[in-house]
């Protein structure tokens, strides 16, 4: 009887999916179903990624075009942009005041660069110490180790960087290089990770991989000169979401059932860069389109039938008094993830958490500014380094006082 009911429920769900499916849904299903087939599977699998990116792009095209048109029609927009970029150091200092010492804030900041940061990728990668290190059992669970050749004798603080990509692209290539190279130059050990993505790996596979990387670092990073007792995590866009969620769900059994018993997935600090922090809210057209994208591509379940999945995946709903220190960075003119996401998240953190919460809102900056905007990227990477170094010093000082 139970088997009949299960079969009936499956059949009803299948019919319901057929009735609401669109052409892109069929392409995604074809790619996922055919990806494991011999011979042709490897050719069908990329179709899912391309389709998923297309679905994501279609949902943001109108916002992007609207913002672009508004800019073009705004008198004196070039002067406004110049002034916004010139204010990066000033707003960064203001955001860190009270968190970072005045002496550290007074040191010389990086000069703005004219060329897009992506053009300097090779220069940053001189700090890559080891490539394609496995952090899990799956061949896709890879990381690069960034560090100086002349490491200090004592264990170095560690940063795990989680790249973005709308939860359908999780490659460590290009992303985060300015932050990784700056911290590596200062003696940190940095781990830049890949993780598995939709549509072939639906949620919560993404966060499970991030948790696996954290547990791996806690157990193994000392082999590369890192301090297993200080692990920070940072990420941009989808990686910002994953970093925040990881920081707020330390050792949550829901997200580490696959890990060995006793694995430690806690982190000591979080930096979220233009991240998405709410998977539930559908109060605006933009947010409703985003949830629809999650339902169709990332989660592959509906929020009406599985509200707990979307709630549990929302960092804004997971904030507790014991949250680690946070630095949240967002551009005021982000048309992919509107800045209200960051503002609401920071408000929640400051109301609940006992730890320090920094918020750096960059005037005029858009999504992905750290790849395209040389005037902002250097100072922002410097601000992140100041924040993380301060958290590390405070933690070390506290440990000495306890001893």
Curated annotation (Swiss-Prot):
The keyword Coiled coil belongs to this UniProt entry's keyword annotation: no
Compartment annotation: Cell surface; Secreted, Cell wall; Secreted, Capsule
Pfam family, one: BD-FAE
GO biological process: glycerolipid catabolic process
PROSITE patterns: CARBOXYLESTERASE_B_1
Keyword Methyltransferase annotated: no
Active site annotation, chain numbering: 237, 334, 367
Reaction(s) catalysed by this chain's protein: a fatty acid ester + H2O = an aliphatic alcohol + a fatty acid + H(+); a butanoate ester + H2O = an aliphatic alcohol + butanoate + H(+); a hexanoate ester + H2O = an aliphatic alcohol + hexanoate + H(+); an acetyl ester + H2O = an aliphatic alcohol + acetate + H(+)
Main location: other
GO cellular component, one term: cell surface
EC code(s) of this entry: 3.1.1.-
Molecular-function annotations in GO: acetylesterase activity; triacylglycerol lipase activity
Keywords: Cell wall, Hydrolase, Secreted
Enzyme class: hydrolase
Cysteine disulfide links: none
InterPro entries from the UniProt entry: AB_hydrolase_fold, BD-FAE-like_dom, Carboxylesterase_B_AS, GDXG_lipolytic_enzyme
Protein family according to the UniProt entry: Belongs to the 'GDXG' lipolytic enzyme family.
Summary of the function given for this chain in its UniProt record: Esterase that can hydrolyze short-chain esters with the carbon chain containing 2 to 10 carbon atoms. Does not have lipase activity. Is highly immunogenic and elicits strong humoral immune responses in both HIV-negative (HIV-) and HIV-positive (HIV+) tuberculosis (TB) patients. Also elicits pro-inflammatory cytokine and chemokine responses from macrophages and pulmonary epithelial cells. May participate in the progression of active tuberculosis both by contributing to the utilization of lipid substrates for bacterial growth and replication, and by modulating immune responses.
Protein name: Esterase LipC
Taxonomic source organism: Mycobacterium tuberculosis (strain ATCC 25618 / H37Rv)
């Amino acid at each position: 009887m139970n088997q009949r009911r299960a079969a009936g429920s499956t059949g009803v769900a299948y019919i319901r999916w057929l009735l609401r499916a669109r052409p892109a849904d069929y392409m995604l299903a074809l790619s996922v179903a055919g990806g494991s087939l011999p011979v042709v599977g490897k050719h069908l699998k990329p179709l899912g990624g391309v389709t998923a990116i297309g679905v994501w792009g279609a949902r943001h095209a109108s916002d992007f075009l609207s913002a672009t048109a508004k800019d073009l029609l705004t008198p004196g927009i070039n002067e406004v942009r110049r002034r916004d970029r010139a204010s990066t150091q000033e707003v960064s200092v203001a955001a860190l005041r009270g968190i970072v010492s005045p002496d550290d804030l007074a040191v010389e900041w990086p000069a703005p660069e004219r060329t897009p940061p992506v053009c300097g990728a090779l220069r940053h990668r001189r700090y890559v110490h080891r490539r394609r290190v496995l952090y899990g059992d799956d061949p896709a669970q890879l990381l690069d180790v960034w560090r100086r050749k002349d490491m200090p004798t004592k264990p170095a603080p560690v940063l795990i960087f989680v790249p973005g990509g709308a939860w359908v692209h999780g490659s460590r290539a290009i992303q985060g290089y300015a932050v990784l190279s700056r911290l590596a130059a200062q003696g940190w050990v940095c781990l830049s990770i890949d993780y598995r993505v939709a549509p072939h790996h639906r949620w919560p596979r993404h966060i499970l991989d991030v948790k696996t990387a954290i547990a791996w670092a806690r157990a193994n990073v000392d082999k590369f000169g890192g301090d297993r007792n200080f692990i920070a995590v940072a990420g941009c866009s989808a990686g910002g979401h994953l970093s925040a969620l990881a920081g707020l769900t330390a050792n949550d059994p829901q997200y580490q059932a696959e890990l060995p018993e006793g694995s430690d997935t806690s982190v000591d600090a979080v930096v979220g860069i233009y991240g998405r922090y709410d998977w539930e809210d559908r109060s605006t057209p933009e947010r409703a389109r985003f949830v629809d994208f999650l339902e169709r591509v990332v989660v592959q379940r509906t929020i009406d039938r599985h509200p707990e999945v979307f709630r549990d995946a929302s960092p804004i709903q997971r904030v507790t008094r014991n949250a680690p220190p946070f630095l949240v960075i967002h551009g005021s003119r982000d048309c992919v993830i509107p800045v209200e996401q960051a503002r609401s998240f920071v408000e929640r953190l400051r109301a609940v958490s006992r730890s320090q919460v920094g918020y750096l809102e960059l005037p005029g900056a858009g999504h992905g500014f750290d790849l395209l905007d040389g005037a902002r990227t250097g100072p922002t990477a410097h601000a992140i380094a100041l924040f993380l170094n301060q958290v590390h010093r405070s933690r070390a000082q506290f440990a000495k006082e306890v001893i």
